[in-house]
C-alpha cells in the first residue's frame, strides 16, 4: 500500500504522484495541491482564488475527493496513518493481522431495531448500524467528508479486517451519484487487491436523476461501481437494510 502525507505545498507535476497513491492524508491550512497556482489562474481566467480555496485540504477532502483524510496537524496526520496501517496488510500477498478483543462475535444488539424508522421515507444514520455490528464499535472511515451519500471504511469482525460499503440515507436519501460511485469503486478495488472481504449495507432508492448527472457522465462513472464489484474475487456479503431499487440495487453488490 502507498500512503501520501500532504504537510506542505505541492504544485504542478508533483501533485500527480500523491493522486496515484492508495491514500492521501492532508493537514488543514498547511497541505495544498494544485496543478496550477492562484497566480496562473488569475492570469489565464481572471479568477481570484486563494491557495486554500484552490487546492487546500478541505477543498480536496469535500469537493475533489483527492484527500481521503483531513487532519488538524502533523501529529494527527501520523496517528491517522498508524491507525490505517493497523487495518491493512504490508503487501498484496499477505493477509491482514488478527486483532484479538473481548467483543463476543455472537453478541446481539437488540437496539438495532430501534435505529430503523417504521416509515421507509424517513432518514436514519447508517453509521449507527455499522457501529452495532463491528468489533468494539470501532469504524475507521475513509473519505468521510466526500460523497457523504455513501460510506466506506475499515472495521473488524471477530478480529479480522473487513471493508464496509454502505448507503447513507442522511445524504441524498442514499442515492448513488457520480462521486459516490467513484468513491465506492476505488475502495472496493483496494480491498480486492489486499485480500480484505467486503460487507455491503444497502438502502438506496436508485441512481441520482437530472441533467447535471447525465451530462457529467453518470452512466460512465456509475458503471465503475458495477465493474468493481464484479471484478472483485474477495468474499462479498451484501445485506439489504431498506430500499434497493433499479440499477442501484444491481450496483450495490447484488447477487445479479
Task: Identify what each model region corresponds to.
Residues 1-256:
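Ligand-binding clefts of soluble mixed alpha/beta catalytic domains
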